[in-house]
Amino acid sequence: MLDIWPKLSQSPILQRFAWSPLIVGAYDRNRDLFELKTHRAPIPDALSENVTLPNYLGGLLVVHIRRGDFQGHCKYLQKQSCGYNAFNVFPEFSDRFEPPSDYWSRSTYYTDHCYPSSERIISKIESVRQNHGTIRRLYIMTNAKGSWLASLLAKLEQTASWDAITTSRDLNFTQEQGYASQALDALVAQRAEAFIGNGVSY
C-alpha cells in the first residue's frame, strides 16, 4: 500500500477527513481520561458543525494491545509468513519486521511482535517513555480480558510512576456512541504524543 500513499494522501477522502459529531461527542464525554486540565480546550455542543478538538495530546502515550482471537491468529500469520501490514511499514517508523529463518527463533519473533507478553509490553513502553522524556500518562486500548489487564496494570504501576493509567474499560459512552468505541480509540491515538501499535493488526 505504500505505493499508493502519495496519491491517497492527497485524495479528498483524507484531505477533507473530519471526525463525526458522534465521535467528537464520545471524546468530550471521556476527555478527562486523555487531557491535562491545564491543556483542555473548550468543546462546543457536540452536535455543532464548528466543534474543535485538541490537535495534540501532549504527555500522553497510547498503546494498542490486541488479545482475544489474536493468540490463534498470530500463529496463522507466522504460518503464512505475513509481515507488517498496510502503512505499518513506512520507512520513517523505527520498528522493523525482519523475522529470522530458523523456525524456533521465528516463532518467538512473531510472538514478540504479534502477541507480546506483559514483560515485553512493559519494556517497550518504558523504552518509548525514556526516549520522549515528557510522557506522564498512559492510555491502553485493548480487548484483553479483565484479569489479564488488571495484572498488566499492576506491573506497570510497580515499574514506574505515572500521573494516570487508563484503558478502554474506563470509557463511558451513550448507547449510540458505544457502537463506535474503536473510532474514539483511533482519534486519541492519532493525537497522542506517542503511539505504540501492533504492526500486524489492521
Where are each of the predicted segments found?
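Conserved blade-ending motifs and adjacent loop-strand segments that build the rim/top face
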Residues: D170-A180
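A donor-sugar binding/catalytic signature common to diverse glycosyltransferases
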Residues: A180-Y202
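Core catalytic architecture of nucleotide-activated donor-dependent transferases building glycoconjugates
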Residues: M1-L171
